[in-house]
Amino acid sequence: MQTPWRSPTRSTVAVNGRLPEHEAFRRRELRFHRYAYWFVNGVHVSIRLGKDDKLCLLVVIGVREDGTKELLAVEDGYRESTDSWSAVMRDLKARGANEPVLVLGDGALGTWAALRDVFPAARRQACWVHAIANVLDCLPKRLQPRAQTMLHEIMEAPTRADAALALERLRDELEAKDPKAIAKLDRDWKHLTAFYDFPAEHWRHLQTSNVIESSFATVKLRTRVTKGAGSKTAALAMAYKLLDAAQERWRRFNDHHLVADGLAGARFKDGIRVTDDDNDDNEMTDEKVAA
C-alpha cells in the first residue's frame, strides 16, 4: 500500500534539504534499461516563495525497451534555458542513460539546443497539441473551428505525403487570411512529421506530450491548494512525489515489442517497417528510372 504524500518536515528531509527518496531517485543508475523515446517538458508552477514565486520543473520521461514509461528526471531549471536542460541531460548520460532514438517536447528552444549538444543523434518530434494551439491563437475565432478540423486531418494523415497535401489544403484556405498561422507549421514541419519514421502503432503516443501535461496538471493543482511549499527544494520534492505516484497510471506503449526493434536500428517509412527486400526493390526502381 502506497504511503500518502505528506509535506516534508525536518525529520524527513535530507541534510541538503531533499527528501531521502528524491535524493536516491536523482542518484540511481540508469544503465540497466535502454530508452527508445523521451518525453521532455518544462512547466512553471506557482509556489509561495516571496520574490522568487515560480518553480520551473524540468521533467524527462523515458520509454523502456518493454514499452513501459519511466520517470527519469524531475529538476528545477531557470526558464527552460539551454544550460538548465544541458545539466539535466548530462546528468542522465553520466548515470548510464543511452541516447534516445526520438525526443518529444513542446518546442522550447533551450530543450533542443541542449539535446543537440548532449545527444546529437537523437531525433526531435514536436508536440501536435501545442502546434495546433499555436496556429489557432493566430486566427480569429470565426475561423478556428474549421482550421482545427483541418489541422487534425494533417496530424492524422496516414502518410507523410498525405500530410503534406492536407497542409497545402489548409494553406489555400488560410494563408491569405493569416500567413503567420501557416508559417508556424512550415517552420516546424520536419519535426512535426518525424513520427512517420516510427511504428504506426506508436503514433498515438508520439504525437503529443500529454503524458507530461496531464501529470503536471496534478502538480499545479496541488501547489495551488497548499499554503505554500516554503522553499524551492521542498516544492521540488512535492512535485517528485506526485509525479512518482502518477507513473503507476501511465499507459504502456502499444505493440511494445516494436520499441526494442527501434532500439536495434529497425527503419520505418510511414509507420511500416522497411526490410532489405524493400531496399532492393527501391534500388531496382531507381535504376529503371535512370535508364
Regions found by a protein language model. Name each.
Residues 9-16, 20, 83-90, 94, ...:
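Solvent-exposed alpha-helical segments within well-ordered globular domains of core cellular machineries
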Residues 133-159:
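Conserved phosphate-handling catalytic cores of large alpha/beta enzymes
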Residues 120-138:
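Inter-helix linker motif
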Residues 5-8, 12-105, 109, 113-114, ...:
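RNase H-like nuclease fold core
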Residues 156-291:
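Acidic/histidine-rich catalytic cores and adjacent linkers
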